[in-house]
Each structure stands twice: as C-alpha cells, then as structure tokens.
Amino acid sequence: MALGSAALFVLTLTVHAAGTCPELKVLDLEGYKQLTILQGCPGLPGAAGPKGEAGAKGDRGESGLPGIPGKEGPTGPKGNQGEKGIRGEKGDSGPSQSCATGPRTCKELLTQGHFLTGWYTIYLPDCRPLTVLCDMDTDGGGWTVFQRRLDGSVDFFRDWTSYKRGFGSQLGEFWLGNDNIHALTTQGTSELRVDLSDFEGKHDFAKYSSFQIQGEAEKYKLILGNFLGGGAGDSLTPHNNRLFSTKDQDNDGSTSSCAMGYHGAWWYSQCHTSNLNGLYLRGPHKSYANGVNWKSWRGYNYSCKVSEMKVRLI
C-alpha cells in the first residue's frame, strides 16, 4: 500500500467475534514508524456518584385551559339572616283623589272616558270609597249594579245585618248592601233598570223612572217611580212604599213572615209579585213563589237564570 507524502492514513481493522471485543488500529505517520494500538474491552460500570444539587427554579409555565365544570354539589345550609337594610327614600306622591274630586257614580265615570264594564271605586256623600260594578254597555251605560244573580254560587237567604252591609263576590253574585244602596240613591234622582234572563236564552227588562230606599231607621223603605216599560213587565210597583224584610226581621204586611215563607229578603207586602233574592232554583220549579221570581215575566214557578238590578243618576 502506498502512502502520500503529506497525508495521514488510518487503517482500522475491527474484528467482531462472539465473546471478543478487541479493536486493532494501525497508524502510519509520515516519517515515523508504524504504531499499533490494541483497545481492550470496556470495564465494569463504576459506582453511582453522589446526587447533584438541585438546579435553580425554572420560570413558571403559562396557565392551561380551564377544565370541564364539575357537577353541582348539594345545597348548603341556609345562612343566617342578614342585617336590616337602610330604609329607602320616600317615593313621590300619587295623584290625589278624594270624595271632593273623585267620581260619585258610574255615570260620572262614563263621562270621564271609562267605557269598559267592570269594578270601579266611587265616593259616597259621606266620603266613603265604595267599589262597585259599573255596567257601561247596557242602555247607554253608566249603571251602578247593586244586585246580581247568575249561578247560585252565593246564599241569599241571609239575615238583616248581611243585607245591611252587603255580601257576595265580585266574580259572581252579590248584594251591594242596603246602607250603600241608600247612600247611592239619595244623591239625586236615580232611575232603575231590572235585567232578567231565563235558561232558554231569553232576555228582557223592566225600567222605572226613579228608585230610592230610605235609611235603616225607616227599615230601608222602597220609594219607586213610574214603570217606563220593558218586556219583563211590571212586578215591582206592588212593593212600592213597603219596608225591607229578612228572615230575622219581619216588616211585611202579612200575618206570617214572607221572608221565611218564600226564602228571600225583599220589600214584601202580602207577600210578593217579585222575589229576586229568593232561592236559585234553575228554571221551572214545583214549589210556589220561592225562587228568583218575576211574576209578570215567567210567573211564580220559574226561577230566573240571571237577574241584575241597577241604578243610574238622571
């Protein structure tokens, strides 16, 4: 083998054999003799050195993405009540309303632009506010309803005190109360309208030129004007100038109690031609004259489905 003058040649011969690991190296340097190096097998690993000191703390990594929310835990115990807060400032005063400026009748409400039938507050002559049903649809509107029967949901066979104060429900049947009716009908001349319906779908009415009841000292005596007409006919005039009677106060002209005998409360004479506060018997009935009767319309053996008594200031 020829060797260049300025080159370094390394000839490496590696011999691998099972169980052997020598490696023979022959080096030939220009101008020197050949040098042969024989490398032996690696020795056994030395013992582990001592543990090095901990390195300096690295920079904190960036926060990872939020994990999936866990399930809601059970409700904890109720906490103690907090301290009472500071009282708020007084609000602005609402629009003033008094008996001097407030409406006195449903007719007055109608003239003020209240055209829907419903419950309104009016003011009686003694300044008492009174919630009343205003019929704004029938015969020109402006009627104050003081009696209504329509489904038998309210018991009308009651005592003197109940009729004095009034009873029933705004959602159904009611009697406005004799004291209230007296106050309403002493403000001036009020006309009366009685609206009736039967269970066959027929409707009719009776109308009177004036209607007033006196105070309790006069036993709520009825003062009735002329019958003006209506298909229901006149079944109230015979009760004119009669006193009001209930099951516990008999003021009629009969030797027996008309209120007890006909299960009602009315301006009975001897005894009646109308009994609109009688038993709610739902149409034809075999019993005599103890239903919601108006003799001139359906007779003594037919109890009306609906009756409404209402007044309007003229």
Curated annotation (Swiss-Prot):
It is found in: Secreted. Pfam families: Collagen, Fibrinogen_C. Glycans are attached at residue 301. InterPro entries: Collagen, Fibrinogen-like_C, Fibrinogen_a/b/g_C_1, Fibrinogen_a/b/g_C_dom, Fibrinogen_C-term_domain, Fibrinogen_CS. GO terms for cellular component: collagen trimer; extracellular region; plasma membrane; serine-type endopeptidase complex. Its main location: secreted. Residues 49-101 are annotated as: Disordered. The keyword Membrane does not apply. Gene3D superfamilies: Gamma Fibrinogen, chain A, domain 1. GO terms for biological process: cell surface pattern recognition receptor signaling pathway; complement activation, lectin pathway; G protein-coupled receptor signaling pathway; host-mediated suppression of symbiont invasion; positive regulation of interleukin-8 production; positive regulation of opsonization; protein localization to cell surface; proteolysis. Ca(2+) binds at residues 250, 252, 254, 256. Residues 40-96 form the Collagen-like domain. Residues 97-314 form the Fibrinogen C-terminal domain. Disulfide bonds join 99-127, 106-134, 258-271. It comes from the Eukaryota. Belongs to the ficolin lectin family. May function in innate immunity through activation of the lectin complement pathway. Calcium-dependent and GlcNAc-binding lectin. This is Ficolin-2. It comes from Mus musculus. The lineage of its organism: Eukaryota, Metazoa, Chordata, Craniata, Vertebrata.
